[in-house]
A protein has these predicted regions:
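Alpha-helical "hinge/linker" immediately C-terminal to small N-terminal DNA-binding modules
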Residues: 2-30
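Central regulatory/effector-binding core of bacterial HTH transcription factors
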Residues: 36-97, 158-159
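Short, well-ordered beta-strand segments
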Residues: 38-42, 90, 129-130, 176, ...
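Ligand-binding "clamshell"
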Residues: 97-110, 185-197
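Hydrophobic/proline-rich hinge and linker segments of small-molecule sensing/allosteric domains
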Residues: 98-140, 204-214, 229
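Secondary-structure junction motif
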Residues: 127-151, 217-221, 225, 235
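A late-sequence structural motif
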Residues: 195-236
């Protein structure tokens, strides 16, 4: 059978159309099957409490079949777990260095948290409440203290977790130096005094989504990373 030029054109386009339909069906099947699974995410306490729920909720609205396993720990421990491939990715507070890719997701300002307004010049004579935090956060706050008061921070009462420190502050037992999320003052009725550098700028701590550089990731993890880049990333 010999086709006319018009018939040959239609036959060629019909073949292309069938191949297109086949590719679309395969793509939809792959998309559906690969975007089912569990993502193991590390997150420090404060990010989990104030930010992570909203991030996961927004992502879950688009991807109903994805489950999450959340590992709560300090950022330095989470960063090590990422480097050692114990978790696929994690949110870490502070600028940790290593063989990773990272996405800036939050910048938190530092404050002195107290029951009542304070005079910064009298701060060294006041009761300090310390708590468990990561090394990078401590380094930033300790450096500010040394630059401001000329000596190391005093050893204060140790509260363990930061939320217990806030509760002790609320009882008037001292002050705490913390990086706080937006909206903190709506949850805790405490006095916040901004911690500023010599130029009057806020002391900032970065929070990153971190994952191993060059590692082959599943489509589920890659999709979550893309969601963070498209919806959460702070572009400096």
């Amino acid at each position: 059978m010999k086709f006319t030029p018009e018939g040959e054109y239609l036959a060629k386009r019909a073949k292309e159309y069938m191949e297109f339909i086949k590719d679309v069906k395969h793509g939809l099947y792959t998309y559906k099957t690969e975007l089912e699974g569990t993502i193991k995410i590390g997150s420090p306490y404060t990010y989990s409490k104030f930010e992570l729920t909203d991030v996961l909720y927004r992502y879950s609205q688009e991807h109903k079949n994805i489950k999450f396993e959340i590992i709560n720990d300090q950022s330095n421990n989470l960063f090590r777990m990422i480097l050692e491939n114990h978790i696929e990715l994690g949110f870490v507070c502070g600028d940790f260095e290593g063989d990773v890719d990272k996405i800036l997701v939050k910048q938190n300002k530092a404050y002195i948290v107290s029951k009542d307004p304070i005079d910064l010049m009298k701060l060294p004579q006041m009761q300090r409440i310390d708590y468990k935090t990561n090394d990078k956060s401590k380094e930033i706050l300790d450096e500010w203290w040394k630059n401001t008061y000329g000596n190391n921070p005093p050893v204060g009462m140790f509260a363990g977790y930061v939320e217990f420190a806030w509760q002790l502050v609320d009882k008037g037992l001292g002050y705490a130096c913390c990086f706080l999320p937006e909206g903190f003052e709506k949850v805790y009725n405490l006095c916040l005094t901004p911690i500023l550098d010599d130029d009057g700028n806020s002391i900032i701590r970065n929070t990153w989504l971190v994952y191993p550089k060059g590692k082959q990731m599943s489509s589920v993890v890659n999709n979550f990373i893309k969601f963070i880049k498209d919806n959460i990333e702070i572009r400096e």
